Amino acid sequence: MATKLTERQQEILDLIRQTVARTGFPPTRAEIAQALGFRSPNAAEDHLKALARKGAIELTAGASRGIRLKDAEPTPSPILASLSQLLLPLVGRVAAGSPILAAEHVEREVGVDPSLFSQAPDYLLKVRGMSMRDAGILEGDLLAVKKSSEARNGQIIVARLGDDVTVKRLQRHGSRIELLPENPEFSPILVAPDDEFALEGVAVGLIRTHALH
């Protein structure tokens, strides 16, 4: 890092690292403000901009979780991954009714450093659309997914609803399931009791596609 950080900036950077390690995703401005006792998210935004100017993080405009640690970017994967890397199938478009990891969906294998993720993922899913923009998940990103049929309230999940596979935030209200986007331009999805719904996995991290070029 080229420029020395202030004590407060270092606290924020440590909080971002801890949140990414625990959840796989960076905190929002409001979460930073609450954790560090700021009076408003605007104060957190000012510190984040200072961290970006000093080269510690990269900010994505318009996304509440659009924070990326500059020192956590994975290196380009070689043809043969090193022993320290994890080879993960990269899943592109998923055909209706077929398993996510069916051979025809796997575009290639990508070598990644497992320490980048909160848990070891089982595959990478290419993100399509901008419904999770405010969680910092953008079109073309690679979402690291751990296969699971269970998830906690508030976790970002990969779910199959009918013939579609979608990435959303899980919200349960008793027996009712709602799939929440992170973009006000998209509407929540209420899962009806007779819908064909299956939880395919939980998100444990994210790779920006430019890191693989």
Swiss-Prot record:
Its EC number is 3.4.21.88. Residues 29-49 bind DNA. It comes from the Bacteria. It comes from Bordetella avium (strain 197N). Keywords: Autocatalytic cleavage, DNA damage, DNA repair, DNA replication, DNA-binding, Hydrolase, Repressor, SOS response, Transcription, Transcription regulation. The record marks A96, G97 as: Cleavage. It holds the Pfam family LexA_DNA_bind. Represses a number of genes involved in the response to DNA damage (SOS response), including recA and lexA. In the presence of single-stranded DNA, RecA interacts with LexA causing an autocatalytic cleavage which disrupts the DNA-binding part of LexA, leading to derepression of the SOS regulon and eventually DNA repair. Homodimer. GO terms for biological process: DNA repair; DNA replication; negative regulation of DNA-templated transcription; proteolysis; SOS response. The active site is at S131 (for autocatalytic cleavage activity), K168 (for autocatalytic cleavage activity). Disulfide bonds: none annotated. It is an enzyme of class 3 (hydrolase). InterPro entries: LexA, LexA-like, LexA/Signal_pep-like_sf, LexA_DNA-bd_dom, LexA_repressor, Peptidase_S24_LexA, Peptidase_S24_S26A/B/C, WH-like_DNA-bd_sf. One of its GO terms (molecular function) is serine-type endopeptidase activity. Belongs to the peptidase S24 family. It catalyses: Hydrolysis of Ala-|-Gly bond in repressor LexA. This is LexA repressor. CDD domains: S24_LexA-like.
